[in-house]
From Swiss-Prot:
Keywords, alphabetical: Cytokinin signaling pathway, Developmental protein, Differentiation, Lipid-binding, Sporulation, Transport
Gene Ontology cellular component annotations, sorted alphabetically: cell cortex; extracellular region; vesicle
Name of the featured protein: Acyl-CoA-binding protein
GO biological process: cell differentiation; culmination involved in sorocarp development; cytokinin-activated signaling pathway; DNA damage response; fatty acid metabolic process; protein processing; sporulation resulting in formation of a cellular spore
Source taxonomy: Eukaryota, Amoebozoa, Evosea, Eumycetozoa, Dictyostelia
Signal peptide: none
Length: 84
């Protein structure tokens, strides 16, 4: 089984780029798994990329770090079949 740390490294080695939605899901799960609940102020709506990342992370509020890491690994394993 792949560990969270291995998955986080291997995502960077994908030969094809996942969709923006997939990347945002990975980002949110990674931040929740490493930092816990979102602890930054909400970006302005005109900061489109920052706002999307904030929303992806904040949507996971209340998810434990362990659950977020497990979901990250599961998502990585799913995406690896398409992008690795």
């Amino acid at each position: 089984m792949t560990t969270f740390e291995e998955a986080a490294q291997k995502v960077k080695e994908f030969t094809k780029k996942p969709s923006n939605d997939e990347l945002l899901s990975l980002y949110g799960l990674y931040k929740q798994g490493t930092d816990g609940d979102c602890n930054i102020s909400e970006p302005w709506a005109v900061q489109v990329e920052a706002k999307a990342k904030y929303n992806a992370w904040n949507a996971l509020k209340g998810t434990s770090k362990e659950d977020a890491k497990a979901k990250y690994v599961a998502l990585y394993e799913q995406l690896a079949t398409k992008y690795a």
